[in-house]
C-alpha cells in the first residue's frame, strides 16, 4: 500500500482555471502564474507546466530557490522573483536567468555592478509601494527620483514596473481604487520624463475578478489559479473556478471504546458514550494544526466525523460511531471538494484558505490526476 496520506492535485482543474482567467482578461494580456510556496502547496513544477500549457506566459516566485527548482525542471519562460534578493545570491540569479524585483536604489546598483562584471544585463521589474506598506519605492518625489536613477544604470534592463493591492478582496473597493490611482500617477510622471516599461502590472487574483481597469499589460493570478477564491467578499459568479487540491488519508485503526474513555495527549476529551474511534495517520507535522483538536471534521463514507482529543504530531482520532461498517484502509477526505471545502477548515482555524493549503507538509505525497 502507498503512503496512507496524500494530497490529490487535479491538474485538469488548473487548466480550467487558467482558461477561465484568460477568458476574463482577454487574449492580449500576459498571464504570470504565481507558483511561490511550492505552488501554494500544490507542487510548483507540475502546476507551472500545466499553467503554461493552458495559456500562462510567465511565472512568479518569492525565493531564488523556487526559481532554481523551476529552471532545473527545464522551464525556460521568464520567472519574476517577487521578493528580496540578497547580494550574495545575485550572481546565481543571473546564472539562472531570473528576473529580479528592485525596490531600493542601492540594491539596483549592486545588481547592475554584478551584471556588468559578468558581461550581462540583469532584467528587473521595479516595485512601487502604493499602500501595502511592504517593499517598494514610495510614490512621491523621492521615490520618483530613485526610479529615474535606477533606469539610468548601465547593466540593467528595466522591463517592468508593478504594485500590489492590499484590499482588492474586500467589499469596500475605495482603497484599491486609491492605490491604482497612485500607481497610474507614478507611471504618468515617469512617462513625462520619457521612461516607459514593456510590462506594467498590478492585478492580483482579487483585482482580476473585481477591477478590469487594473489589468494593464499583465495579470498575476495566485490563489485563483488553484481554484480558490481570495475571500468571501468577491463576486464568485464572475469566475467559475475548480479547486485543485483534496487532502486524503486512510484509516489505520478502528476500535470500540466505552463511555469515559480518554482520548489523546492531556486526556482533554472524554468519550460520553460507547462509540468507535478511528485513527488517521495525519498530524500537525503534516500541516493539520493542533488547533483543530476536538474541533475539526473529516468525511468518512461521505459523512462528517469529528476530530476528538488533541491532534498529535503524526496522528489524530475521529469519532465514527455513527457511521456503519468503518474499516481500516477506508478513504477519508480531510478537506477538498464541495462537501468539505478548504474554506470551512480555514473558518474553524480563524484563518484563510491560502494558509490551509500552504500548510500541507512536504512529507505528504502529491498525487497528480488529470
Curated annotation (Swiss-Prot):
Its EC number is 5.1.1.1. The active site is at 36 (proton acceptor), 265 (proton acceptor). Gene3D superfamilies: Alanine racemase (3.20.20.10), Lyase, Ornithine Decarboxylase, Chain A, domain 1 (2.40.37.10). CDD domains: PLPDE_III_AR. Substrate binds at residues 134, 313. The modification N6-(pyridoxal phosphate)lysine is found at residue 36. It is an enzyme of class 5 (isomerase). This is Alanine racemase. Disulfide bonds: none annotated. The keyword Isomerase applies. Pathway: Amino-acid biosynthesis; D-alanine biosynthesis; D-alanine from L-alanine: step 1/1. It comes from the Bacteria. It comes from Desulforamulus reducens (strain ATCC BAA-1160 / DSM 100696 / MI-1). InterPro entries: Ala_racemase, Ala_racemase/Decarboxylase_C, Ala_racemase_C, Ala_racemase_N, Ala_racemase_pyridoxalP-BS, PLP-binding_barrel. Its cofactor is pyridoxal 5'-phosphate.
